Amino acid sequence: MKTLLVFFFLFGSGALIGQIHKTENLIIVTLDGMRWQEVFGGVDSTILVDKRFTRDSEDIARRFWSPSMEERRKKLFPFLWSTVLEQGQLYGDRNIGSEVNNANKYKFSYPGYNEIFTGYPDTAVNSNKKILNKNTNVLEFLNKQKGYHGKIAVFSTWDVFPYILNKWRSGIYVNSDQDSLGFNSNNLKLIEQMQSLTTRPLGIRPDIFTYFAGKEYLLAYHPKILYIAFDETDDFAHAGEYDQYLHSAHAEDAMIADLWNTVQAMPEYAKKTTLIVTCDHGRGDKIKEQWKDHGEDIEDAGHIWIAALGPDTRAEGEVKTAMPLYQKQLAPTIAALLGFHFTPDRGVSEPVSTIIY
């Protein structure tokens, strides 16, 4: 691949000049705790046949297995390995020398999401408790920019996101878990009824309702930035249910495809929207039983991945990186795609220049 150098010329408002960009809207999607091993390699054959983790190995093999790694991963993530592969970029396949890492040492959710959105791996962010985040996040920064105020929306399954993004200070609309959908939209009213009446086998709003709430909000209110945060992959992994972990990952890929196709059919979004897909942390693999887990004591749980697709992102497919990339680079990348320069409260973090022309 060719190395792209991006030169930023800044002025006081944080906007960029000297760079032509086409992205006017941004969609961000996270799959909580989704391992890079399945994203780039498909179903793990060792876990597949382990009856402790996979109840119906024959069914999973029929749906997702192939002797070919390329076929396996495409069966599991057809959108990533068709549209994104052909038109965008994927980072994190360590088998080809593409490394993406957590910069934070904790390797679990709140520190990971903090790093994604603030660009700073804060050592004070070291629990998953509902503590208001003191760090300024990139969505909060963009909410203050002309044309973006009140045009940012977040829909999450996990109910800690209002604290991670500090919605009370940032002014960002964040709808999480059991939050009501009090909008004048018949479809959103229906989703409100459905999510209030449905069973909650994982103790959280099912990802499908998080998705449809976000999609219907986009159709009704046309935000400039939409973030959808899925959670089921992490929950099923912790439960040791590999088959359900795979089913959720496959379903979330389909939801991402549906959302991308939806915006490509809308004139205000088509050819003006960039999609970023990533995760908050990885999981264990060197010790196979640790696929369920993550955290500071699991060496390889900080290995993550990024996918990007949009009008300012070259069609490179799998990208080999000369140097490791870090999760903290996503916040300035998000801003740069929209023509702004975001500086973390502390530390220095540069955008992923290859995602941007």
Where are these regions (language model features)?
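Non-catalytic, well-ordered alpha-helical segments in soluble enzyme domains
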Residues: 145-146, 312, 321-357
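Histidine-centered active-site microenvironments of extracellular/periplasmic hydrolases
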Residues: 50, 278-309
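Active-site His/acidic residue clusters
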Residues: 167-169, 215-258
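Long, well-ordered early-domain segments
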Residues: 64-161
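Bacterial Sec-dependent N-terminal signal peptides
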Residues: 1-22
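Active-site-proximal N-terminal segment of extracellular/periplasmic enzymes that hydrolyze or transfer
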Residues: 19-89
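Acidic, His- and aromatic-enriched active-site or binding-groove loops in soluble protein domains
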Residues: 118-131, 171-202, 206
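Metal-dependent active-site segment of extracytoplasmic phospho-/sulfohydrolases and closely related
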Residues: 27-28, 36, 253-292, 334
